Every structure is written in structure tokens, then in C-alpha cells.
Regions:
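N-terminal Rossmann-like NAD(P)+-binding subdomain of aldehyde/semialdehyde dehydrogenases
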Residues: 1-123, 151, 293
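Short glycine-rich or small-residue beta-strand-to-loop segments that form or flank ligand, phosphate
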Residues: 47-50, 62-66, 133-135, 160-164, ...
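A general secondary-structure junction signal
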Residues: 81-85, 196-198, 354
Length: 354
């Protein structure tokens, strides 16, 4: 992460204070955190019935207040995620938290649609599913929780979160803060809840629970597969491998800036981060020069061969061609390249190999 500045130190202090304030005994639902799936779903269902009965204007007020509170907490939650998971870049997590807080659509997406004609009038009004079960990943715990929350409650739903076990503390902190903001604005308690000790088993229980009407999953292939077999509607986001295509019409300086910004964002742990670069042959040298001018490290074939031995150091699992070294996931290029004897600073955000 590099040297701590005054802002970082202040966030650490806020984090510790908040942590001490939240130690109020065992989870039992008073803060939206439940020890078992059934209790969480039952409380969430009660809250959803109250929530869906409120006027749409009240939803707007609550969501506006929630956004305000989440903006205030963006830095502390970013620190919490970085501290617990050890993945990505703290400063990028702040930007990510603010992005989903400000840009996730709210009730403005619920506009009714009407058709009229010779056969009469048809009115389309969107209705809530009810209780939604959401499985969140270790790579994107805070932003996924915020995004899911705003979108789901805007539609009149409630949500039960099952966090990745390696991100349970920061996800719990987010859920508690969300619940407090909703109640402050006049919404019902337990509209957004979580599982105190999330596991693979609790995730499976949540996906198959008769009290949930929809499953939302953000994660790897295995959890997505389970969700698709759960017997109910599922919205799933799995692994991503997005390409960048650069041709001779591109502004190469701008392209280089965008490539580094997108591919290095939060150390490429987001599925939508660009991961492949395809370039028209006639401009390769010019684009490489533009990337190097922005401190991008271009690896040689020999360096890549050494790096592959570090990145794919784990035994391959069944059905996989290679085993990924999990210790390298989400780390700065400086930490990864150090493993093969290349020393660069943390200001090097991206390394590219052909």
C-alpha cells in the first residue's frame, strides 16, 4: 500500500473507533446481523412488507439519505475491505465505493409504461420480488453490497446478504451502517440484513430457502453454478476476461491512459477490469511507447516465463489446466514482480506481457 499519509491515519482511527462502538454482544438481529439464515429471512420478510407499503416518495427520501451516509463512510469502508482482504488498492476502493453509491439507479428506473389502442389500455407497473438473497465476493465486498442494496430496495425488495467468509467483517460493517441509515430516514429495521458467520453452507441455505424469491450472486464459477441449480430465478455475475481493442484510429496517448486506469483499477480484481490488450500491428510500437511513458512495465518473454512459474505455482484443481497462486491475487505489481527479481515502485500500476 505504500507510506501512510494523514488521511490514511485518520481513517484508521475512525475504523478502530467504529469497531469498538459496534462490539455490543452476540448477533441476534438488533443491528441486522443474524446467526442463522431462517431468522434473517423472516426478519427481512417482515421489513419488506412494511417497506413495500410505504409511498414511493418515502423510498426516494430513504435512498437519498442512505447515499449521503454511504458517501460519508466511503473511506472507512474502503480501509476496512483492504485491511481484511489484503486485496487491491485502498485509494481505488474509495473511488469504487463512491461510484456505486452515486450511480446505482434508484426509484427513477420504476417509471410506469402505458400502451393504448383499439383494444384498450395496458399499464405496466413494476412490482417487487420480495426477499432477495445476495451472495457477495471477497474481491468486491463493499461495492457489491452497496450496489445490490440500492437497486433492490429501490424496487421495493428487502435483501439478505451472505458475504464471502474472507470479507465478513467489512461486509457486516457495511450492512450495519446501511441499516442504521435506513432507520434514521424512517424506513423499517432489518430491510437489509446479513449472516453473522457466512459459510458455503449458509450460502446454499439462502439460495434454496423458500422465503427468498430471487437469488443474486456475484462470485466464481462454482457458486454461480449452485445458484443456477437452486430452483428459483437467479441473476449471476461470474468471472470476466474483458479485452481492450486498439486500432489505428485511436488517440494513442488517451488509449494508454485509459488502458492503465482500467486494467490496474483495484489491482484488476474486478471482473469488469480489462485483462487482454489487442492492438493493430501497425501501431504496436507507438502504443508501447505511450504506455512506457506512463510508467507501465513491459515484460520480456524471459521475464514472463519466470513470472508464470510464480503466478501458477499452486497445484491444478480438477478440471483446471493450471493452479493459480492465490497469494498473488490483487497485489501491487511491485509485490508480484519482486518475486522474479524485478524491483519497481508502487507508482507502477500495470505490467504488460506479450
Amino acid at each position: 500500500m505504500g507510506d501512510l499519509n494523514e488521511r490514511d491515519i485518520n481513517n484508521i482511527v475512525q475504523y478502530v473507533i467504529a469497531e469498538l462502538q459496534e462490539r455490543r454482544g452476540e448477533p441476534g438481529g438488533t443491528s441486522g446481523i443474524f446467526s442463522d439464515v431462517s431468522s434473517a429471512v423472516a426478519a427481512s420478510a417482515r421489513a419488506q412488507r412494511m417497506w413495500s407499503a410505504l409511498p414511493l416518495e418515502k423510498r426516494k427520501e430513504v435512498i437519498a439519505h442512505l447515499r449521503e451516509r454511504l458517501r460519508e463512510q466511503a473511506q472507512v469502508l474502503a480501509w476496512a475491505a483492504w485491511r481484511e482482504t489484503g486485496l487491491g488498492r485502498y485509494e481505488d476502493k474509495i473511488e469504487k465505493n463512491l461510484l456505486v453509491t452515486n450511480k446505482t439507479p434508484g426509484v427513477e428506473d420504476l417509471e410506469p409504461v402505458a400502451w393504448s389502442g383499439d383494444r384498450g389500455l395496458t399499464l405496466l407497473e413494476r412490482a417487487p420480488f420480495g426477499v432477495i438473497g445476495s451472495i457477495t465476493p471477497v474481491t468486491n465486498p463493499i461495492a457489491t453490497t452497496i450496489n445490490n442494496t440500492i437497486a433492490m430496495i429501490a424496487g421495493g425488495n428487502s435483501v439478505v446478504f451472505n458475504a464471502h467468509p474472507s470479507a465478513k467483517e467489512c461486509t457486516t460493517r457495511t450492512i450495519v451502517g446501511i441499516g442504521q441509515a435506513i432507520v434514521e430516514a424512517g424506513g423499517p429495521a432489518n430491510l437489509v440484513v446479513g449472516i453473522a458467520e457466512p459459510t458455503i453452507e449458509s450460502a446454499q441455505q439462502l439460495m434454496k430457502h423458500p422465503g427468498t424469491q430471487l437469488t443474486m450472486v456475484t462470485g466464481g464459477e462454482a457458486v454461480v453454478h449452485v445458484a443456477m441449480q437452486s430452483g428459483k430465478r437467479a441473476i449471476c455475475a461470474g468471472p470476466g476476461n474483458p479485452p481492450i481493442v486498439v486500432d489505428e484510429t485511436a488517440d494513442l496517448d488517451q488509449a494508454a491512459r485509459d488502458i492503465i486506469k482500467g486494467a490496474s483499477f483495484d489491482n484488476n480484481i474486478i471482473c469488469t477490469d480489462e485483462k487482454n490488450l489487442l492492438v493493430v500491428d501497425s501501431i504496436v510500437d507507438r502504443l508501447v511507447a505511450a504506455l512506457q511513458a506512463l510508467n507501465c512495465r513491459i515484460l520480456t518473454a524471459e521475464e514472463l516465463a519466470r513470472l508464470e512459474k510464480v503466478i501458477f505455482a499452486e497445484p491444478a484443481k480438477k478440471g483446471q489446466a493450471t493452479g493459480l497462486n492465490k497469494k498473488m491475487i490483487g497485489q501491487n505489481p511491485s509485490a508480484i514482480l519482486k518475486e522474479i527479481g524485478i524491483n519497481v515502485g508502487d507508482d507502477v500500476r500495470l505490467a504488460i506481457a506479450e
